[in-house]
Amino acid sequence: MKKYKPKSGERIERQEEVIPPKVELPFEFSPEHYPVLLQEVLAAFYPLRDKKELSYFDGTFGRGGHYMALKYAYPQMKATVMDQDLAAIAFAQSRFQTEVEKGQLNVIHGNFTQFSEHNLNNFDMMLLDLGVSSPQLDQGERGFSFYNDGPLDMRMNQQQGLTAEVLINTASEDELIRIFKEYGEVYRPSRVVRAIVNDRKTKAFQTTGALAGLIERVDGWQVKGHHPATKYFMALRLAVNSELEVVAEAIPKMIRALNPGGRLAVISFHSLEDRIVKNIFRESEDLGRTVTKKVIVPTQEECDRNSRSRSAKLRIFERSAQDELTKL
């Protein structure tokens, strides 16, 4: 059979040569929080398995679930991890003290947009697991969840930034409408916003329960199984932490920090985040390629096991190898 020759200017989609096998994790694998899309993330880095040395960067360490599994699958890996949540940093330094002392793990407190400030480069594997971790959702005092009453905080880094309480009690009616429409994709937030502005004149909103109760009273349960406050809380969290802007700023830098042939995997939980990731990957095709045409989503089995995973989306970018760069 003759080898196909592309026409001038024609782009060829490179296909994966190997279907990665499922990684059977040991019985003692027991992360505090079972990570989303774990097997899919392990598969994303499978083509790098034969490298004698592997460098890994995790910009959203959380409770280290992905790190633990990757360390088991690729024992030659050395890792640098970041998180802006001090609780996650304290957990990493305690749970993985041995790895830190051996120089196998470098733990840094900060937002992943700051990784270039630490002169971090030349990674084979990079991962971002965007959104809120389960421990953050389960702790009412963090203010992320309407199911656990607590102060309206919502800051990923509690040492800095505006709280959701300040935002909800001081932003203008027009600004709140913009936030809920733009970040939460709420179709008609005007009634809820008017109620917020009216009620805060007599008593400021201080707790998640108070805000969720107002939204439930005004909006009602429009979709079965989805609390009416879901999109409103997500919009506030995105606004408080400037999450969309952070993603747009960080990903191009991370692509350039990859070694030739290295891969960046990004898990998002919001359509706007996923759109940003997709567009940046497309705009970066002079540096590499998007590994899969279609976005990767959790299996039904995973969604049944962990309902919080149902909106997760995974995209993978591969930096061109040096020998490929000369051919393009």
Curated annotation (Swiss-Prot):
Belongs to the methyltransferase superfamily. RsmH family. InterPro entries: RsmH, SAM-dep_MeTrfase_MraW_recog, SAM-dependent_MTases_sf. Specifically methylates the N4 position of cytidine in position 1402 (C1402) of 16S rRNA. The keyword Cytoplasm applies. It comes from Bdellovibrio bacteriovorus (strain ATCC 15356 / DSM 50701 / NCIMB 9529 / HD100). S-adenosyl-L-methionine binds at G64, G65, H66, D83, F112, D129, Q136. GO terms for biological process: rRNA base methylation. It catalyses: cytidine(1402) in 16S rRNA + S-adenosyl-L-methionine = N(4)-methylcytidine(1402) in 16S rRNA + S-adenosyl-L-homocysteine + H(+). PANTHER family: 12S RRNA N4-METHYLCYTIDINE METHYLTRANSFERASE, S-ADENOSYL-METHYLTRANSFERASE MRAW. Its EC number is 2.1.1.199. Keywords: Cytoplasm, Methyltransferase, rRNA processing, S-adenosyl-L-methionine, Transferase. It is an enzyme of class 2 (transferase). This is Ribosomal RNA small subunit methyltransferase H. One of its GO terms (molecular function) is rRNA (cytosine-N4-)-methyltransferase activity. GO terms for cellular component: cytoplasm. It is found in: Cytoplasm.
